[in-house]
Design a protein with these regions (language model features):
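Major-groove DNA-contacting interfaces characterized by cationic-aromatic clusters
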Residues: 2, 47-48, 111-119, 134-164
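N-terminal core-binding DNA-recognition domain of tyrosine site-specific recombinases/integrases
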Residues: 1-39, 43-45, 152-157, 172-177
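Short, basic (Lys/Arg/His-rich) helix/loop patches that form interaction surfaces
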Residues: 23, 78-80, 93, 129, ...
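Catalytic-site neighborhood detector that most strongly recognizes the C-terminal catalytic loop/helix
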Residues: 67, 121-123, 200-226
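Short amphipathic helical patch at the helix-1/turn junction of helix-turn-helix
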Residues: 17, 31, 90-92, 186-188
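Basic, Lys/Arg- and aromatic-enriched nucleic-acid-binding interface segment
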Residues: 23-29, 42-97, 101, 121, ...
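Conserved tyrosine-mediated DNA breakage-rejoining catalytic core shared by Y-recombinases
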Residues: 55-56, 70, 93, 102-138
Length: 228
């Protein structure tokens, strides 16, 4: 720890900010570094906690999530593959970008046309999502590779491909706007409340320990099919 300099640490923070990491995420990293330095000082491994001097810049307010309009979704369909693949999969599954990046072909059940999310951070996030009929051909076309989105193995690469599609249809959205749109559309179509929570990976009192009964899967399919 005594060999680590302030400039080295600040350059790490600067790089994180330049790649689009949020202020709150960088603050958590600074807190962790500070705790490591405090522990090192107690054990006489160093004498100064440089984390206290790290500059995170200004905490800019995060843009509120904006749902896609029906017109924008229709423009995505007209855009065609492969450019429209990522946004449409996100829009019709409600997945997080990180979940899509980690989705493997083996997680897809061809017979039942479902996908199993296993890379979630929480227990409730591990879930099964029925695949909407409209995006089945997109998914099926990608099942020869190990990963469904084989061309994007990092968030930054997925974000680049997503932004290409947004520019092509002349709109501005984030990947998380797709998840927000998914939830909003289900609400607008009167989807079952518990089905919506299960699809999004939120905890629900009706389904325990991640066990999906035939009935609950049927409810999920019914909810998914409400999306046009």
């Amino acid at each position: 720890m005594s060999d680590i300099t302030y400039l080295q640490l600040q350059s790490i923070i600067d790089h994180m900010l330049s790649t689009g990491l949020s202020y709150s995420s960088c603050k958590k990293v600074r807190t962790l570094i500070s705790q490591l330095f405090d522990y090192s000082i107690i054990n006489c491994w160093c004498t100064t906690n440089y984390a206290k001097f790290l500059n995170l810049g200004h905490n800019k307010p995060v843009r509120p999530h904006k749902p896609f309009t029906t017109q924008a979704i229709n423009r995505l369909w007209r855009l065609g593959p492969p450019l429209h693949d990522i946004p449409l999969i996100l829009l019709y599954t409600g997945m997080r970008a990180s979940e899509l990046i980690n989705l493997k072909a083996r997680d897809i059940n061809r017979k039942q046309r479902t996908m199993r999310i296993t890379s979630a951070k929480t227990k409730s996030g591990i879930r099964t999502i029925p695949i909407h009929d409209r995006i089945w051909s997109i998914i099926e076309r990608r099942l020869d590779a190990v990963y469904v989105i084989h061309e994007c193995r990092t968030y930054s690469s997925l974000s680049r491909e997503f932004n290409k599609a947004m520019r092509a249809i002349n709109t501005k959205h984030t990947t998380h706007d797709c998840r927000h749109t998914f939830a909003t559309r289900l609400d607008n179509e009167g989807a079952n409340y518990n089905a919506k929570r299960l699809l999004l990976g939120h905890a629900s009192g009706n389904v325990t320990d991640g066990v999906y009964t035939h009935k609950s899967l049927g409810q999920l399919r019914k909810a998914i099919r409400l999306l046009k």
